[in-house]
Amino acid sequence: MKDEASGQTVDTGAATHAFDAFLRDDALLKVRDLSVRYRRGGKIFVAVDGVSFDVAPGETLGLVGESGSGKTTIGRALLKLLPKADTRVDGHVEYDGLNVADLSASDLRAIRSKLQMIFQDPISSFNPRRKVQDIVGEGLEIQGIRKAERLERVDRALNDVGMSRTMVEGRRPHQFSGGQCQRIAIARALAVGPELIVCDEPVASLDVSVQAHVINLLQDIRQKRNLALIFISHDLAVVRNVSDRVAVLYMGRIVEIGTGDAIYQRPAHPYTRMLLEAVPVPDASRKIVPSATPTQALSRSAPPSGCRFRLRCPRAQAVCAGEEPKLASMPYGQFAACHFPHDEPAPGIKTAEQA
């Protein structure tokens, strides 16, 4: 297809089905065409729109995007933690062969030990009246685990995060720092023996030095326990360091997905490159120069036609307004939803052919 304004050829059909083949049938978690809509003040707001991905056992998938991109909503939808009132969830979420949407409340409780979530602000998810050792063992208590086994598993979970029952005994959440509270939250998730943990901005509210410690801790625990992680963040640099694969979200849709190295070194989508503009780097040659293209405020209740990023995109052409791009295979292994994707490496990156 040729864009009338530019004269460039736009391949809108090639590789559109390749992404379906990219999704794995043997994944631990399979998400297909997930959509979430909220009704607010008589209007429908689309938070997530047709998102598909999967997570293999022991894999970390990063979800990255600006505030309002839908990443946290996806995490909560996977665990059925969204409010039922004025919320509509469509699509298919399958965990270990079970359709999560079809599970009754009792069946969902039965698999909750396998699917856990760590929140950005751990203190708000703690009961301030309870002692920390009871908070860590709360899930085990709900499962009816005997006290002796419960204490043993609490000890193991605390040890995995660099703490001990002696350290927390008799103390409550407000007596610990933010980093310690996040470690306690991780221990609480680990105690029930999960196979997949959704980490929702787990380091966003922490100091940089503490962030590195928590990220390294999650990496060590993942390898030790063969855990699958979904790591949600607005910071592409953080996501890249912790993830096997990265999905970039914009206005509720995945615009690029692939390995961290492919996306960081060869960002194909203009929005991915814009996210990289915000990453501080010591080497000035590595910095992507911000675009001077003016941006417009976008409505979640009435998104623009065609490509949703086109009103902020320096490469937008006429076809971008008339036809929505689909995720298609890029030369370096990732998939991107763009009519005019970048092919050049990010500034400062020396590719294999240049070495």
Show the residue positions of the predicted features.
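A short, proline-enriched helix->beta-strand linker immediately N-terminal to the Walker B motif
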Residues: 191-195
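Conserved ABC transporter NBD signature motif
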Residues: 87-99
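P-loop NTP-binding/switch modules centered on Walker-like glycine-rich loops
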Residues: 66, 80, 202, 206, ...
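Conserved ABC ATPase signature
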Residues: 172-176, 180
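Q-loop/switch helix immediately C-terminal to the Walker
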Residues: 121, 129-141
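Short catalytic/signature loops enriched in Gly
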Residues: 4, 13-27, 44, 257-355
